[in-house]
A protein has these predicted regions:
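N-terminal secretory signal peptides
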Residues: 1-10, 19, 23, 27-28
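Ser/Thr/Pro/Gly-rich, low-complexity intrinsically disordered stalk/linker tracts of secreted
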Residues: 9, 21, 75, 141-146
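C-terminal segment of N-terminal export signals and the immediately downstream linker at the start
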Residues: 30-58
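Short beta-strand elements of extracellular/lumenal beta-sandwich folds
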Residues: 53-77
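Serine/threonine-enriched low-complexity regions used as flexible
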Residues: 63-66, 134-159
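Short solvent-exposed strand-capping/beta-turn motif centered on an Asx-Ser/Thr pair
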Residues: 69-75, 86-88, 134
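A surface/secretory-pathway sequence property marking extracellular, secreted
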Residues: 76-110, 115, 147-163
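Low-complexity, intrinsically disordered segments enriched in Ser/Thr together with acidic residues
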Residues: 114-141
Length: 163
């Protein structure tokens, strides 16, 4: 067994040498921008066509995104359509529409774009997506769009609807 001595404190020369090598690196990293922030896309118009029916559910048909007034493209994962249905009612959804992903968390169904929505172009969205369930007459649902900078028009559906 050896009697190893604990390492001695570094010498002044070792500390100064290390500092002289690290100073330029620290200066360079301090002068670099911390992040290159891209401006968030704003504008565009989303028309949500569809309807709702007690005992059946909510459906979308012929919905459209118009990027004519958008500041740029909405990249994947930037657009969400969030539908909240009454709690306690079992429901199912159709398969994810082309260009979108569907997730369900409790009574909230979220559709998120998986492909970019280009600026300056019309793009059909949501296909014939539906949420089916035996929702009682008089119960309510909500449909929200994120980001809120997209102008949203509802045709046959309502942002705050009643079955």
């Amino acid at each position: 067994m050896s009697n190893a001595q604990p390492p001695a404190d570094p010498s002044r020369r070792t500390v100064l040498t290390a500092l002289s090598w690290s100073a330029p690196v620290l200066a360079l990293s301090a002068s670099a921008p911390t992040a290159v922030a891209s401006a968030a896309t704003t504008g565009g118009a989303l028309t949500l066509n569809g309807g709702s029916s007690a005992g059946e559910g909510i459906f979308f048909a012929g919905s459209n995104y118009d990027g004519a007034t958008a500041s740029g493209p909405y990249t994947a994962q930037q657009l969400q359509v969030i539908v909240t249905v009454p709690t306690g009612v079992p429901f199912t959804t159709s398969a994810a529409p082309a260009g979108f992903d569907v997730s369900v968390d409790g009574n909230v169904v979220t559709l998120t774009n998986t492909t970019p929505l280009p600026a300056g172009e019309q793009t059909p969205v949501l296909g014939d997506f539906f949420i089916s369930g035996s929702f009682a007459v008089g119960t309510s649902y909500t449909v929200r769009v994120a980001p809120t900078t997209i102008t949203t028009t509802f045709t046959g559906l309502a942002a705050d609807g009643t079955f």
